[in-house]
Amino acid sequence: MSEIASRVKAIIVDKLGVEESEVTETASFTNDLGADSLDTVELIMEFEKEFGISIPDDQAEKIGTVQDAVAYIEEHAK
């Protein structure tokens, strides 16, 4: 697991209060991890803060799984 993936996983565990074992690459924030729309917005904001990036709303809407988040951040983080 990459450093970015580990950090993303830690943020998800912290913000959603789920077990680390539940946070798999294919886990959906809403369907598998129980996030509502507000939780998802808070996750995106935390990813932006943690990685020093800006995620436009149209891109944020496409980030629905752990792997989606990791891939976006790996592509855009400096």
Swiss-Prot record:
* PTM field: 4'-phosphopantetheine is transferred from CoA to a specific serine of apo-ACP by AcpS. This modification is essential for activity because fatty acids are bound in thioester linkage to the sulfhydryl of the prosthetic group.
Q: Which InterPro entries match?
A: ACP, ACP-like_sf, PKS_PP-bd, PP-bd_ACP, Ppantetheine_attach_site
Predominant localisation class: cytoplasm
Give the Gene Ontology MF terms in alphabetical order: acyl binding; acyl carrier activity; phosphopantetheine binding
- Location within or outside the cell: Cytoplasm
Using the record, list the residue span of the signal peptide; answer none if the entry has no such feature. Answer: none
What Pfam families does the annotation carry?
Answer: PP-binding (PF00550)
Which UniProt keywords are listed?
Cytoplasm, Fatty acid biosynthesis, Fatty acid metabolism, Lipid biosynthesis, Lipid metabolism, Phosphopantetheine, Phosphoprotein
Q: Name one GO cellular component term.
A: membrane
Tell me the pathway.
Lipid metabolism; fatty acid biosynthesis
| Domain (Carrier): residue spans on this chain | 2-77
Which Gene Ontology BP annotations are present?
lipid A biosynthetic process
Is the keyword Nucleus assigned to this protein? no
Lineage, top-rank taxon, reads Bacteria
Per the record, the coiled-coil ranges are: none
Task: Provide the positions where the record notes the PTM O-(pantetheine 4'-phosphoryl)serine.
Answer: S37
**PANTHER family noted in UniProt:** ACYL CARRIER PROTEIN (PTHR20863), CARRIER DOMAIN-CONTAINING PROTEIN (PTHR20863:SF76)
Q: Which HAMAP family match?
A: Acyl_carrier
* Biological role stated in the UniProt entry: Carrier of the growing fatty acid chain in fatty acid biosynthesis.
**Which family does the UniProt entry place this protein in?**
Belongs to the acyl carrier protein (ACP) family.
NCBIfam families of this UniProt entry? acyl_carrier, PRK00982.1-2, PRK00982.1-3, PRK00982.1-4, PRK00982.1-5
Protein's UniProt name: Acyl carrier protein
From which source organism is this entry? Bacteroides fragilis (strain ATCC 25285 / DSM 2151 / CCUG 4856 / JCM 11019 / LMG 10263 / NCTC 9343 / Onslow / VPI 2553 / EN-2)
